[in-house]
Curated annotation (Swiss-Prot):
Record note on quaternary structure: Homodimer. Heterotetramer of two MnmE and two MnmG subunits.
Protein origin, superkingdom: Bacteria
Alphabetized UniProt keyword annotations: Cytoplasm, FAD, Flavoprotein, NAD, tRNA processing
Gene label: mnmG
Pfam family, one: GIDA
Organism: Buchnera aphidicola subsp. Acyrthosiphon pisum (strain APS)
Main location: cytoplasm
Full protein name: tRNA uridine 5-carboxymethylaminomethyl modification enzyme MnmG
GO molecular function: flavin adenine dinucleotide binding
Binding locations of FAD: 13-18
Family as reported in the entry's similarity comment: Belongs to the MnmG family.
Localisation: Cytoplasm
Signal peptide: none
GO BP: any one term: tRNA wobble uridine modification
Binding-site positions, NAD(+): 273-287
């Protein structure tokens, strides 16, 4: 063994969590080492070829607002962009993009290679190095020590990973890559709570064997959306469609007859899978009355021959997979070029983490991504960014940062994980956020970019553009308030004729925009509108802020009330056994979870309002004692 180098931060794993962690820490000026089994797999889209979706896109926008790279990577590699829930309110509208897998990986690789303070090496980590209950480095399989002030573990499905196809299984981190067995064994020797989860993927189909005739076509939206606040439609490669087909009774019968060959239904596979992304076997068993299920045929790239049949994730034997595929319209003669499979892997109880994603048990050790019990690229990447920036702050002996639930979807994600934990892969949805009208996609930069700048994550060009956008929005909103329309003006006649609006008194453009049938583009057709702005992103924010001003104000007032509990800290309480009046169940949960505030304590299952009242009384008494 020999001492090769010293670093501020070491990141283990280079998937979506690891790459964002490494970028965040290096952008903050920390000397960072990113270790991966294969540099050729940096930021690989291991499963579905898509970024975004309901709730997930909000995380991508927040990563971007904090200077992360996921939004930029998908803008340069996305081959189909759509806005989901476009007919619904702005709180739940979500961008989703199909990715060219090769272009996405190449973009991530290019961004990482340009980053200062970052060294990327191929090496498998087999152990952590400790000193006085703190992590101080890692040991690789080839017996090299790397030392650091903090370590981020972002190993994805590689820790104890086991692939299942039918009743056969073998160790692997994903198909074609070996599992990190030694590190898994070592981590299980520590005082960390470990369990198993599983996820799955469908077979890949040769695009040349698919009959797309008579299938429903899905093109990109017009205008084509962008993800990054620094992005532009011109960054997108060529746009191509996806197609929709369905399973049928024949498909379902094939699956029912072969459930005895499923590792899930024969007990070979113990880990719980994602509730909201079930295998086709699960769908057939859980919804026996359904006559069909959607299958989206998603190309994996402009030059790839692989099609991803989204909706038929399976771990049945390959010969059964072939029967399933052949039973589906358009796929009757299709050829499988890679089988579907399930993968079981280690995850660590996220309740053992602080809100900064640092272990409560081992100083300097941070966890990010699927090993925290989440599923999805976006959930992993956002955790990676948070873990990376906090690993950087920790290496500088600086207090960590995390967003609150009212500040970001990332705040919701982290609070849910560390407060409630999870027994199945956790996926983000807009429904998980109680303040979702304030946490829209379009205002992620307004919520987080200033914070990112203070942390050292946001560069000068992004900061200049952000400030110009804020100025444009404020200037235009003020102009709309001052710009009036008279009931005797030609514009009043236009409003009556086109929108059935009968003005009886002077009205501002801002008041007019509050009406549900009026959009900003409608105002532009009025003579008194004069010159507005052309930034579609800013226009969207202006519309939302004006149209939903009343709701946003009420939500802001609610947030203010809740902040009182979030800012009432419990750090002075070391042992809840000493507080009289708490039940033994409540004491055990509080001692186990160690919530940082009254707000977090109130979200722990089983912590009653009465228990919260006792805690508040205790804090008040302690505060009074200190004033004497």
């Amino acid at each position: 063994m020999f001492n090769l180098r010293n670093f501020d931060v070491i990141v283990v794993g280079a998937g979506h969590a690891g790459t964002e962690a490494a970028m965040a820490s290096s952008r903050m000026g920390c000397k960072t080492l990113l270790l991966t089994q294969k540099i050729s797999d940096l930021g690989a889209l291991s499963c579905n070829p898509a970024i975004g979706g309901i709730g997930k896109s909000h995380l991508v926008k927040e990563i971007d607002a904090l200077g992360g790279m996921m939004a930029k990577a998908i803008d340069y590699s996305g081959i189909q962009f759509r806005i989901l829930n476009s007919s619904k309110g702005p709180a739940v509208r979500s961008t989703r993009a199909q990715a060219d897998k090769i272009l996405y990986h190449e973009t991530v690789k290019k961004i990482l290679k340009k980053q200062n303070n970052l060294l990327i090496l191929e090496a498998e980590v087999k152990d952590l190095i400790f000193k006085n209950y703190s992590v101080v480095g890692v040991l690789t399989q080839n017996e090299i020590n790397f030392y650091s002030r903090s370590v981020v573990l972002a190993a994805g499905t590689f820790l104890g990973g086991k692939i299942h196809i039918g009743l056969k299984s073998y160790s692997a981190g994903r198909i074609g890559d070996k599992s990190a067995i030694d590190l898994s064994v070592r981590l299980r020797e520590l005082s960390l709570r470990v369990n198993r989860l599983k996820t799955g993927t469908p077979p890949r189909i040769d695009i040349n064997t698919v009959n797309f005739n008579n299938l429903l076509i899905q093109n990109s939206d017009t205008p084509v959306p962008v993800f990054s606040f620094m992005g532009n439609v011109s960054h997108h490669p060529k746009q191509i469609p996806c197609y929709l087909t369905h399973t049928n009774e024949k498909t379902h019968e094939i699956i029912r007859k072969n459930l005895d060959k499923s590792p899930i239904y024969t007990g070979f596979l113990k880990g719980l899978g994602p509730r909201y992304c079930p295998s086709i076997e699960d769908k057939i068993v859980r919804f026996p009355d359904r006559k069909s299920h959607q299958v989206f045929l998603e190309p994996e790239g402009l030059s790839s021959i692989k099609v991803y049949p989204n909706g038929i994730s399976t771990s049945l034997p390959i010969e059964v997979q072939e029967q399933i595929v052949a039973s589906i319209k358009g796929l009757e003669k299709s050829k499988i070029i890679r089988p579907g499979y399930a993968i079981e892997y280690d995850f660590f109880d996220p309740k053992d983490l602080n809100l900064t994603l640092e272990s409560k048990l081992i100083k300097g050790l941070f966890f990010a991504g699927q090993i925290n019990g989440t599923t999805g690229y976006e959930e992993a990447a956002s955790q990676g960014l948070l873990a990376g920036l906090n690993a950087a702050l920790s290496s500088k002996n600086t207090e960590g940062w995390f967003p609150r639930r009212d500040q970001a979807y990332l705040g919701v994600l982290i609070d849910d994980l560390t407060t409630q934990g999870t027994e199945e892969p956790y996926r983000m949805f807009t429904s998980r956020a109680e303040y979702r009208l304030s946490l829209r996609e379009d205002n992620a930069d307004l919520r987080l970019t200033e914070i990112g700048r203070k942390l050292g994550l946001v560069n000068d060009s992004r900061w200049i553009r952000y400030n110009q956008k804020v100025l444009n929005i404020q200037t235009e909103m003020n102009r709309l308030k001052k710009n009036k329309i008279s009931p005797i003006s030609p514009d009043a006649d236009i409003l009556k004729k086109l929108y059935n609006i009968n003005l009886i008194k002077e009205i501002s453009m801002s008041e007019l925009l509050k009406r549900p049938q009026i959009r900003y583009q409608d105002l532009q057709s009025l003579e008194s509108f004069r010159t507005g702005i052309v930034d579609l992103e800013a226009i969207g924010q202006i519309e939302n802020e004006i149209k939903y001003a009343g709701y946003i104000k009420r939500q802001s007032e609610e947030i203010e009330r809740h902040l009182k509990n979030e800012n009432t800290f419990l750090s002075s309480i070391y042992d809840y056994n000493k507080i009289r009046g708490l039940s033994s169940e409540v004491v055990k949960k509080l001692n186990d979870y160690k919530p940082i505030s009254i707000g977090q304590a109130s979200r722990i299952s089983g912590i009653t309002p009465a228990a919260i009242s006792i805690l508040l009384i205790h804090l008040k008494k302690e505060s009074y004692k200190h004033t004497l």
